[in-house]
Amino acid sequence: MEIFAEGLTSRNHRSAEVIACYRRAVEGLQKKLLVPADYTILFTSSATECWEILAQSFAGDTFVHIFNGAFGAKWAGVSQKLGNPVHAIRYDINAPLPDWQLPPSNWICLTHCETSNGTYVADNQIINIKKQHPERLVALDATSSLGGISIPWESTDYVFASVQKCLGLPSGMAVLICSPQAAHRAMQQGITTHYNSLANSLPLAQQYQTTHTPNILDICLLMKLMENIAPIYLIDKPLQQQAAQWYEWLAQQGFDLLISNDAVRSPTVVTVKATEDYIVHLKSAAAQQGFVLGNGYGEWKNTTFRIANFPAITAAEVMALQEFLLTFQAAKQ
C-alpha cells in the first residue's frame, strides 16, 4: 500500500509529511462531505472521547440531552459525571424529536442515528431546533451517519463520529468538527485543564497538528478515502434508497422491525426484533455462511439483531444476505 511504501506510518507526528496528510484529510472532508471551510476539524481517539472533550472544555455549561437509546443516554451520563448541569430528556423510539419547551441551557445534544435501536433524527428536525434556539450550541453525535448521509452543518456546532461506521476505516480514531461559534466559545472560556481540552487543541488544529500522538494510519487512510469517494450528495440518496429497500423487504418476509414509524428509521442501522432463541440460532447459522449480524444493544441486547447499511456494502452483498435470511426464515416457519 502506498501509505506504507512512503513510510508515512513511521513518521513523527510533527513531521511535514504527517502534517500534509492531516491537511489533505481536512481538505477532503471539506470537499466530499461539504464541511464548511470555517469549521475546525480535529482528530481524537473515539466518539466517547468527544463526549468527554465537550463536557470538560465547557465545564459549567448547562447541557440538554435529548435521546431515545443507549448511546444518547451514556453521553448524557458522561456530561453529568463530569460535573455539568444536565437536563436529560428521553423520548419514545417511534416518535420524532419532541417539540417540547426546553429548559434553559448552553447546549442541545442530539444523536443523529442512534446505533443501539436504529432510529434517526431527520435533518429538518435538527434545522428546526437550531432555528428555535439560535442562541444555543448544538452538539451532534454522528457516529453512524458521518460519511453515509448528509449533515446539516449550518445547524450544528460540535459534530463527531468514530471512523469505523460509515467511513469504513479501522477503529481507533474519531473526527471532531467545531463551528466558529463553538471554537470561539471554547477559546473564550479558556479551559486548558486536560491535554485534549479544545482551548489546547484548536490552535494546533489550525496548523494541522494535535496535542498528542494521533492515529497516523487512520489519518492517512481517511485522506486516501476522501480522495477516492464520491461527494456525499451522491452517496446519501442511494444509501437512503437501499435502506428503504431493506425495510420493505424485511416486512414483506415477515420480520418484525423494532422501529414501526418509517419517518424515524435510521438509513444506516436496520434493527429487527425476534425471540432470544431465534436470534441465537440465526447468528450461528449466519456465521457458518460467513455473515456477521450485529448484536442488539442496551435493553434490546438479546431481542434484536442489527444490519449495517453502510456505503462500503455492495448490492451483491445485500442480495446474498437477503437470500440467506429468506432461507433461514423459511426453514423456521
Describe each model-derived feature in a short phrase:
Residues 38-64, 70-75:
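Conserved beta-loop-alpha segment that forms the PLP phosphate-binding cup at the N-terminus of a helix
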Residues 256-286:
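Conserved PLP-binding catalytic core of the aspartate aminotransferase-like
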